[in-house]
Structure formats: structure tokens, C-alpha cells
Design a protein with these regions (language model features):
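N-terminal signal peptide c-region/cleavage motif recognized by signal peptidases
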Residues: 12-14
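Generic long, charged, amphipathic alpha-helical segments
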Residues: 361-366
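Electron-transfer interface patches adjacent to heme c in soluble/periplasmic c-type cytochromes
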Residues: 170-183, 217-218, 224-226, 236, ...
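Alpha-helix N-cap/N′ positions at the starts of helices
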Residues: 18-22, 328, 367-368
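Bacterial N-terminal signal peptides
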Residues: 2-10
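Short cysteine/histidine-rich zinc-coordinating motifs and their immediately flanking basic loops
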Residues: 243-249
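Extended surface/linker regions that mediate inter-domain or inter-protein docking
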Residues: 54-241, 338, 342, 352-355, ...
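N-terminal mature-domain "stem" immediately C-terminal to a signal peptide or N-terminal signal-anchor/transmembrane
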Residues: 18-55, 59
């Protein structure tokens, strides 16, 4: 009898230790800091009772989930170098706020949404020409969990509500991806960050090249085969969709402000006529127009998704939308991208890698990713749930 009691005690102790170890690992992965003793006890209790998701949800309540985990998770999306070592900005803050409030995560690509610091903190006002507001918020030490306020982006950046497109029209994104160039960078990095594909992965040489702009040579180095077998693969899909950004630019003085620190997002309304195009289309859409003069001349911001045909049907476009595959402006393009299966799958894979410290690598992992994607969709695209489910799945590693 005494031996049975001893064995029972050992088994109970081992099970408890396992639950506590898993609880600590879940908390570490989600919040990036150890749990308090009291929180650890509660989390371990949830795990012992078969409610590991409740344990993960408790870890998500730690302010460090917002101040550290989410900030470092999102920051690389806001710059071309894809580094997390950048100051807090409106792009990062908006994603953090949207996750905190458990809003439909698809809204990051099309909603008239912005998160700013609480007015009671005495911060510099939000500005369209600098990042001082967010830098002061970060320096204040106030937790992003409690200090972010949701406002209408159009009220603060001057865009018409119909021209807002979530983080695409944030100041940070404009500085990084609308600055100079041809606005193709905005499309490419939206594809990388929110569809988990770079252009080479979606290249398709079978599509018509009728919307490829004049600045793309049809015979690079004197060899038209390079265009037909390489360049056309990316541009046939990219150029028609980048047309959605035809009225946007990021203006700054390259002589006095070469890095564009004091620049701002601009948008041509119906009354704005660009001197280079004699239309609302920004002059950058006529850059190097002599390279191939018979090429496409952008007349407006009408975009078309050629990838609904060909190999990129695999991205899972939403065929239930009443105006699928085309539209005007960044907002409707954002809706097109955010409604795809690839968007949902990308968010799940990114969270899995962030929490598990590795990408999905075996059949069990991919089965879990598929299950989490279904859960993500069924629960209103709540990204918190994906963090919780990923942490529970990897708790035993």
C-alpha cells in the first residue's frame, strides 16, 4: 500500500511538473518574458485540466505580448531592409491595436483605420510629416496594450476615406514603399509580407503582357528572349495590380532630406492634375517612358488581377465577391488580396514560425497549419487565436 501511495505521488508530481514546464514555455513564447508565480500556477492548472488554450490566452494578456512580441513581429514589414530594429510607427501600432482589439485581421489591407497614442499621455500630435508621435509613445514606456486608441485614418492623414487602405496607406509604408521608384515596391512588399510570396514565386510567363509599362525593356541587353522568358513573368501580374497605386506618392526634398524622414504621403484627388501626365496619375508612372514607347500608358487607378488565371489561381482568390478581379484604387486591391486563401495561410505560417521558432517542417506541422487556418477564418480572422493555438502546439518541444 505504501508503495502504491509513493508511486501515485511521484506520478502526480511528474504530471504537475510537465504542466508547469509547458505553461512556462507557452508564456515565454507568447510574451517573451517569464510568467509570475501566480500566473504560472493558473496556467498550469488550465493545462492539467485540458484547457491549454486558456493558458495561452492568459499569456496573451501580458503587456509584453504587445510591447515586445507583436512589435518585433510586425516591424520588419514596415521597411525594405525587413529589420525589426526600427522605431515604433503608425504601421506597427495599427497592426498591434487591431490584434489587441480582436478585429478582422484582413482589415489591415483596406480599412480606414489607424491607431495612435492615448491623448492623455501628452504626446506630440500625430503628424503626416514625421514620426515624432510614435517615437515619443515608445520612449514614454507606456504599454501598447493600454495606450493605443483607434481612430479613422482619413481624419488624420487627409486622405478621402475611399483612398485609405489600412497599413498600405500608413505613413511608414508610404515612406518605405512609395518613396521614389515606380510604386511597384508597395505591391512587392505587400505580396511578401501578407501573401508570403516574392515575385519570383508567382511569376507566370503565360499571361498577356498588354499592361506592362513603358519603362520595361522588351529586349534587355538586346535579347528579347530575356523579356519573354523572365521579365514578363513578374510584370504581367504586377503591373496591372500596381496601377491601383497610380494616384499615390511619398513626397520629400532629396537635397535637404535624402532619407525622406520629413516626407509625407500624397494622393491626387479628382481636382489634382499632375504636370507630367496631365491626369491624376503620378508622374512616376511615366518614368523612363522612352525605354519602350509602345508600352502601356497608365490612364487611371483601375487595377485587374491577371493572376485569377494561370498558375496563380492556387493563391485561392475569393470568387464569391460581386466585383472580383478588378477595381479602382488601393482599398479594393487590398480587399482582393486580403480575401485570398494565401493571405490567411500566410498569417498562420508567420505566427507559427514566430512562436515555434521554426517554420512548419513535417506532415504534423502542415496539418496543424491547415487546421489553424480554418480556425482563423471561422473565428473572424482573430490573430490572437493563432498565437494561442501555435503556442499550445509547440509547448511540448
Amino acid at each position: 500500500m505504501s508503495l502504491l501511495i509513493l508511486l501515485t505521488a511521484v506520478f502526480t508530481s511528474t504530471a504537475s511538473a510537465g504542466a508547469r514546464e509547458q505553461a512556462k514555455r507557452i508564456h515565454d513564447r507568447i510574451a517573451g518574458v517569464p510568467p509570475s508565480a501566480a500566473v504560472l500556477d493558473v496556467m498550469a492548472g488550465h493545462i492539467s485540466n485540458g484547457n491549454a488554450i486558456l493558458a495561452a490566452e492568459l499569456a496573451i494578456e501580458n503587456p509584453s505580448f504587445y510591447d515586445v512580441t507583436l512589435k518585433n513581429f510586425v516591424a520588419p514589414w514596415t521597411n525594405e531592409a525587413m529589420t525589426p530594429f526600427v522605431a515604433l510607427n503608425d504601421y506597427t501600432a495599427t497592426v498591434i491595436g487591431l490584434v489587441r482589439d480582436e478585429r478582422d485581421f484582413r482589415q489591415i489591407l483596406f480599412e480606414d483605420i489607424l491607431y495612435i497614442g492615448d491623448s492623455r499621455l501628452g504626446l506630440p500630435a500625430y503628424s503626416t510629416t514625421n514620426n515624432a508621435h510614435y517615437e515619443a509613445l515608445e520612449a514614454s514606456g507606456a504599454s501598447l496594450k493600454s495606450s493605443l486608441q483607434n481612430v479613422a485614418q482619413s481624419t488624420y492623414n487627409g486622405l478621402p476615406p475611399g483612398a485609405t487602405a489600412g497599413v498600405i496607406t500608413s505613413r511608414a509604408a508610404a515612406k518605405a514603399f512609395f518613396s521614389a521608384g515606380t510604386n511597384r515596391a508597395m505591391f512587392r512588399f505587400t505580396l511578401i509580407n501578407h501573401m508570403c510570396s516574392d515575385l519570383e514565386q508567382v511569376a507566370d510567363v503565360s499571361l498577356p503582357p498588354d499592361r506592362i509599362r513603358q519603362d520595361v525593356s522588351r529586349s534587355p541587353g538586346g535579347d528579347s528572349r530575356v523579356f519573354l522568358n523572365n521579365c514578363v513573368g513578374c510584370h504581367t501580374g504586377m503591373d496591372p495590380m500596381t496601377q491601383a497605386f497610380a494616384y499615390y506618392d511619398y513626397e520629400y526634398n532629396p537635397d535637404t532630406d535624402p532619407d525622406g524622414v520629413m516626407g509625407q504621403l500624397v494622393y491626387n484627388t479628382v481636382n489634382d492634375i499632375d504636370p507630367d501626365t496631365q491626369s491624376r496619375v503620378q508622374g512616376k508612372y511615366r518614368i523612363n517612358s522612352a525605354t519602350f514607347e509602345p508600352g502601356y500608358v497608365t490612364p487611371d487607378d483601375r487595377w485587374d488581377n491577371y493572376w485569377r488565371k494561370g498558375v496563380n489561381r492556387r493563391l485561392g482568390w475569393d470568387w464569391s465577391r460581386s466585383t472580383f478581379g478588378y477595381g479602382n484604387g488601393a482599398k479594393t486591391l487590398g480587399m482582393e488580396l486580403a480575401s485570398s486563401k494565401a493571405f490567411a495561410e500566410c498569417q498562420v505560417k508567420k505566427v507559427f514560425k514566430n512562436v515555434c521558432l521554426r517554420p512548419p517542417s513535417n506532415s504534423d506541422d502542415y496539418s496543424k497549419v491547415n487546421a489553424m487556418e480554418s480556425s482563423f477564418r471561422s473565428q473572424g480572422f482573430n490573430l490572437k487565436q493563432v498565437f494561442a493555438e501555435s503556442a499550445v502546439y509547440c509547448a511540448g518541444e
